[in-house]
Amino acid sequence: MALILNEEQQSLKDIAKEFLQKNAPVTHFREIRDTENELGYDEKLWKDMVDLGWSGILVPEEYGGFDFGMVGMGSIFEEMGKMLTPSPLFATGVLGASLITLGGSNSQKQNYLPQIVDGSITTALAVEESNRHSLSQINTQAITVSYTHLRAHETVHYL
């Protein structure tokens, strides 16, 4: 099935392609990787993405977002994939924004969604241990290792 973008979606894709080729080529990814950046991404690049409105693409307009949809966001990720762009856009702009929009209380939406849009927060997904029904039997232990690491049951997971 061919996906045909409308004019706005194509424009967003073109802007993303131009921006990422200029500001986040594959060499940028290698630099982040080789310097062992604790965040795992470039804070200035993330701020620039926020300034372009990418963090608010899936956020409803009533919370300061653009409510542009998954196809629009997908066109950005297609270009990010070509450049191997490390950023918190998926964790924040897709997972965080979607989960809060779909399952958050009105208070949570009013508090967190505008902060996702303006880039003042980033989010991460935490998964509970569904096979454990007693609080005394939970194996996951969260400790502070760095901004991007979580040690869970003797295994390091990168968020």
What are the language-model segments listed below?
Residues 66, 107-151:
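Glycine-rich, Trp-frequent "lid" loop and neighboring beta-strands that shape
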Residues 40-42, 101, 133-137:
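Short, solvent-exposed polar/charged micro-motifs at secondary-structure junctions
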Residues 19-23, 123-124, 158:
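Short alpha-helical functional segments enriched in proximate histidine and acidic residues
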Residues 1-90, 111, 115:
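Amphipathic, small/basic residue-rich leader segments at the start of a protein or domain
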Residues 79-82, 99-102, 158:
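Active-site catalytic microenvironments for nucleophilic, acid-base chemistry
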Residues 149-152, 156-159:
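Single conserved hydrophobic/aromatic residue that forms the stacking wall/gate
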Residues 85-107:
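N-terminal glycine-rich flavin-associated loop
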